[in-house]
Amino acid sequence: MINKFFTSLLITLMITSHAYSAGSSDSSSSKTKTQYDMAVTHIKAAKNLEKKGKLDKAKQKYEKAQKLLIKSNKKKPDSADTLNYLGFTTRKLGDFENGEKYYLQGLAIDPKHIGINEYLGELYVATNRHNLAVERLEVLSGCNCKEYEDLKAIIAGEKISKY
């Protein structure tokens, strides 16, 4: 009788311990950020540094973000979100030509991408191509979004692009 009890207890403990270990969400993979996620974190930090006037530190953050995004794009190509931020960081680092290329690659994947259309419109304003900026605004016209209002004000000269 005692032998059956200990055998049952041992089996119960073994089953219970396996059940808890199988359901654990404490795996390192769930805590690991992707290169894209890390890049977005750097971009947000760079934007905050710009607001504080710390432009050199912001530039360093944009450079780190850009490197991570290039790696992310190689690992998982054809992501409009990645190409949007690649265009953004490249533009922020002063390379409008390659920034535009990234934006256009992203639009080939997702022509209605809100972020790309806004940022590409801003790039067109910055490079004195207002007619192309208006085209981006027209794409955003049905979105009922902040990006539409921001780009509209930038095109009208009522607002300066903060990015």
Regions found by a protein language model. Name each.
Residues 75, 109, 140-143:
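Structural marker of alpha-solenoid helical repeat scaffolds
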